[in-house]
């Protein structure tokens, strides 16, 4: 069945929360010193439910047969001083259910996110990807993203 991508509503928040917890756990698995286990399903449901109605953000869901199989969360920042950037859409989260990967769902989410970013007035999309996530890095590069920064961390005693 075909996949459709649309803006999320509060009714989607529970499933988006479930997927976001899986995304967070994936990151914690990469590096427990960098990624803290902070996200709860209830907290994520409240957060994404609220962001679905925020004027400067968009939560997208990908559906197949009426089931949400992926999501993306993006915020628009007209001026992002910390990144020395203007007119930026920050793609904070994008995740596809592990059983649905490699079926162009991620690409459809990104295409829709890019359209939404343009609608906000953005001229670029920024995202971060975990160093260990080779599949995601290759995917993002395949659709036109390129590396501009490297995050570094030093643990303090």
Please name every model-derived segment:
Residues 45-61, 90:
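A short helix-loop-beta-strand connector motif used in the catalytic cores of GNAT acetyltransferases and
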Residues 100, 104-112:
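Conserved acetyl-CoA pyrophosphate-binding loop and the N-cap/start of the following alpha-helix
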Residues 61, 67-76, 90, 95:
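Conserved beta-strand in the GNAT
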Residues 118-128:
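Conserved GNAT acetyl-CoA-binding A-motif
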Residues 24-47:
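Conserved GNAT-fold acetyl-CoA-binding loop/helix
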Residues 107, 119, 131-149, 154:
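Conserved active-site alpha-helix within GNAT-family acetyltransferase domains
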Residues 85-98, 150-153:
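Conserved acetyl-CoA binding element of GNAT-fold acetyltransferases
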């Amino acid at each position: 069945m075909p996949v459709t991508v649309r803006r999320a509503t509060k009714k989607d928040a529970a499933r988006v929360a479930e997927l976001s917890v899986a995304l967070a756990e994936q990151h914690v698995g990469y590096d427990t010193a960098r990624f803290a286990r902070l996200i709860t399903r209830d907290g994520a449901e409240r957060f994404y439910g609220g962001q679905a109605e925020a004027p400067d953000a968009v939560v997208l869901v990908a559906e197949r047969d009426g089931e949400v199989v992926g999501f993306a969360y993006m915020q628009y920042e007209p001026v992002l001083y910390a990144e020395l950037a203007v007119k930026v859409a920050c793609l904070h989260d994008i995740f596809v259910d592990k059983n649905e990967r490699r079926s162009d769902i991620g690409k459809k989410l990104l295409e829709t996110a890019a359209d939404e970013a343009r609608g906000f007035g953005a001229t670029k999309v920024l995202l971060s990807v975990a160093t260990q996530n080779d599949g995601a890095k290759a995917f993002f590069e395949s659709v036109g993203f390129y590396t501009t920064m490297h995050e570094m961390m030093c643990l303090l005693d």
